[in-house]
From Swiss-Prot:
<protein>
    <recommendedName>
        <fullName>NAD(P)H-quinone oxidoreductase subunit 3, chloroplastic</fullName>
        <ecNumber>7.1.1.-</ecNumber>
    </recommendedName>
</protein>
<dbReference type="GO" id="GO:0030964">
    <property type="term" value="C:NADH dehydrogenase complex"/>
</dbReference>
<keyword id="KW-0812">Transmembrane</keyword>
<feature type="transmembrane region" description="Helical">
    <location>
        <begin position="64"/>
        <end position="84"/>
    </location>
</feature>
<dbReference type="GO" id="GO:0048038">
    <property type="term" value="F:quinone binding"/>
</dbReference>
<keyword id="KW-0874">Quinone</keyword>
<dbReference type="Pfam" id="PF00507">
    <property type="entry name" value="Oxidored_q4"/>
</dbReference>
<dbReference type="GO" id="GO:0009535">
    <property type="term" value="C:chloroplast thylakoid membrane"/>
</dbReference>
<dbReference type="InterPro" id="IPR023043">
    <property type="entry name" value="NAD(P)H_OxRDtase_bac/plastid"/>
</dbReference>
<feature type="transmembrane region" description="Helical">
    <location>
        <begin position="88"/>
        <end position="108"/>
    </location>
</feature>
<keyword id="KW-0521">NADP</keyword>
<keyword id="KW-1278">Translocase</keyword>
<keyword id="KW-0618">Plastoquinone</keyword>
<keyword id="KW-0813">Transport</keyword>
<comment type="subunit">
    <text>NDH is composed of at least 16 different subunits, 5 of which are encoded in the nucleus.</text>
</comment>
<dbReference type="GO" id="GO:0008137">
    <property type="term" value="F:NADH dehydrogenase (ubiquinone) activity"/>
</dbReference>
<keyword id="KW-1133">Transmembrane helix</keyword>
Length: 120
């Protein structure tokens, strides 16, 4: 039989953890001073008055470099559980991990040939 009282602690935790950020935003909105002047609305960079437009276009290479880094960084996290249980898993797990690393290397070679790893 499904008993709801077993989940009381879950619901209490869910309500409290949802109420704390809402209350924090509400209290900061009520207590914060609202003074909008030219000093407040200007952009500030190292104490120097900015010159020109704030909207600059960046080259796509910076984003591609970051994306390739994140992809390979996240993929290496998947190798950690395999490495911790390598002696228990056997030869089939070794072959699967070898194929996984081979796919990563092929992706790295592809990104390298396309120029996604060049900074300038």
């Amino acid at each position: 039989m499904f008993l709801l009282y077993e989940y009381d602690i879950f619901w209490a935790f869910l309500i409290i953890s949802s109420a704390i950020p809402v209350l924090a935003f509400f209290i900061s909105g009520v207590l914060s001073p609202i003074r909008k002047g030219p000093e407040k609305l200007s952009s500030y960079e190292s104490g120097i008055e900015p010159i020109g437009d704030a909207w600059l276009q960046f080259r796509i290479r910076y984003y591609m470099f970051a994306l390739v880094f994140v992809v390979f960084d996240v993929e290496t996290v998947f190798l950690y559980p395999w490495a911790m249980s390598f002696d228990v898993l056997g030869v089939s797990a070794f072959i699967e991990a070898f194929i996984f690393v081979l796919i990563l290397i092929l992706g790295l070679v592809y990104a390298w040939r396309k120029g996604a790893l060049e900074w300038s």
